[in-house]
Curated annotation (Swiss-Prot):
This enzyme's EC code(s): 3.6.4.-
GO MF annotation terms: ATP binding; ATP hydrolysis activity; four-way junction DNA binding; four-way junction helicase activity
Residues given in the record as Mg(2+) binding sites: 42
Positions bound to DNA: 286, 291
Subunit structure: Homohexamer. Forms an RuvA(8)-RuvB(12)-Holliday junction (HJ) complex. HJ DNA is sandwiched between 2 RuvA tetramers; dsDNA enters through RuvA and exits via RuvB. An RuvB hexamer assembles on each DNA strand where it exits the tetramer. Each RuvB hexamer is contacted by two RuvA subunits (via domain III) on 2 adjacent RuvB subunits; this complex drives branch migration. In the full resolvosome a probable DNA-RuvA(4)-RuvB(12)-RuvC(2) complex forms which resolves the HJ.
One GO cellular component, as annotated: Holliday junction resolvase complex
Domain of life: Bacteria
One GO process term, biological-process aspect: DNA recombination
Protein name, as recorded: Holliday junction branch migration complex subunit RuvB
Amino acid sequence: MNEYIGQGNIKKRLGLAIKASKIRKEALDHVLLVGPPGLGKTTLAHIISNELGTNIHVTSGPILEKQGDVAAILTNLEHGDVLFIDEIHRMNRSVEEILYTAMEDFQIDILIGKGPSARSIRIDLQPFTLVGATTRSGLLSAPLRNRFGLIMELDFYSIDELSKIIERAAIVLNVEIEKDAAILLAKRSRGTPRIALRLLRRVRDMSTIRGKVKIDIYMVEEIMFLLGIDKEGLDELDRKILRTIIEVYNGGPVGVKSLAASVGISEDSISEVYEPYLLQSGFIARTHRGRIATKKAYNHLGIKVQRGLFDEE
């Protein structure tokens, strides 16, 4: 846990809960990890398992199609094991129901047979910890959400945290990187470790081809230009989203369905991948009527702000 960079508050809360559960020799409370893709939810799930000294069983919401799929996993868990369900918000509601008694009472009811002769059998489970990961906690049903004792909202990472992650990853990748280059790479990574590591690998490719021993700031700048990533970390699709809101919908408001259709990507991609960072960075704002482009978005794209549009600010 101490080696995990970033998410300081979450690490403290988890560390306290894990230590207490180990003293009591009880299963850790169920944990829900919430945040945009690439912030380390899966990594945290594995760290929880490692800190508890138990096994982790990994699955995802979309592939759990029948109650029997969940029952098969639950009955194979040992005391204190961690069951990690990624994209838990995409789990079938009928499948979700079997988790209610499993999470609360460590029991499940299985229906044997069909028709009038069918009977229900209650099976006791070993105490376990369910760790769910979601990019959209609002899509979880209230009964499921309420059964999580620990709900952790992951934040975007700071430049300093990302640069440390990049420097550590560079050692693993057997490549040297200058401090300034790591900081620049961090600034273009949208506050997301997964993106930072992906960009580092692309810069490493150029370093390999050119036979350079160390990655410098000029190499990072060149790769960012090739990838179309600007100083704010926005790529072509980010800018297309902003430009569409401004030019097609006169700055907004616009609903996610209309915006997705205009840009040519799915609603989920807008909501889960692009919108969180654009909101966090102040390029868009969300109102009850839809998304609107902010003055920062106009300035970033070099588009003249309509007279009177932001006068109230």
